[in-house]
Amino acid sequence: MPGFTDISWIAALIFTTDWVIRLGFALRVVMRRRSVGASLSWIGVIVLLPFVGAIIYLILGENRIGRLRGERFERIRPQLERYLDGLNEQAAADPQSLAPAQRALARHSTNRYGFPLLGGSSVELLPDADAIFARLVRDIDEAERTVHLAYYIWWNGGRVEGVIEALLRARQRGVTCRVLADAVGSKQFLRSGVCRRLRASGVEVVEVLPVGVWRMLFRRQDLRNHRKIAVIDGEIGYTGSMNMADPKTFKHEVGVGQWLDAMVRVTGPAVQALGLVFLSDFDTETDEAFGDFEAEGGLHDIQPTGSVVTQLLPSGPGFAREAIRETLLTAIFGAQ
């Protein structure tokens, strides 16, 4: 065509490619069936930022955890579901003991998460770091079979050293010790001599969701494992808001004061549910292919220790998407 230069062809190609990418990614956003606000926000980013918007969406727009990790969880799902069915038969709570709004919430949670409503547990609130560290170290020192710890942040120093020494003592007694530490939140710990010392003693320390430029192409790097769980001998469990970090020493240079956290110490059937979450995470991350959660995870039939009704609501890969948000909305709508 007269007057149509090579530069014009290049410009036309770039223009066409740009709009094909924008429209294609906008259609993908719509097909993901997010909330209206989230969908419009992502479409705005894609349309208003040529090429860059699509790259941002690829990195942050979808909950991609990696194909292999997803396949590993699907492999253990049947075993997990069988164990949950058995747990339900053994320790199911009577929904009629709950208020109507609580029954509706429990029914919704069971359908979305698959974890049953359990009775017969005891729950002790540990309101500060002093109580948490003291009880945890004591329980680890009394462990006979397994110590399982999963934390988003593991930060060396302060009273965390007491936990580390307790783990080393447990290994000397022949106790199986496993630690899950998030690659981002626990970077300081995972690169430290303390971690190497634990591994040398036989503690299985696993870096959860490793990060890297290459991995960015296949998995979102901002999706982290934020669990704070401890399960000891399949009989004692801890969960709550405190990471494995001493508030007196953790990032004190920031100058914002000590973090205020709390945990609960649980005994009874609820501990088995916590143990299952840890084991499913550990198996998914390591591909160890546990043949039997009960035998290798230290789980066993637990007699009632109290009268508290509990239900575990786990999030993360393999579990229902948006389930936590839906549960909170269900609770709010049922408020009286």
Task: Name the predicted role of every residue range.
Residues 1-334:
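N-terminal localization/anchoring segments of enzymes in phospholipid and broader phosphate metabolism
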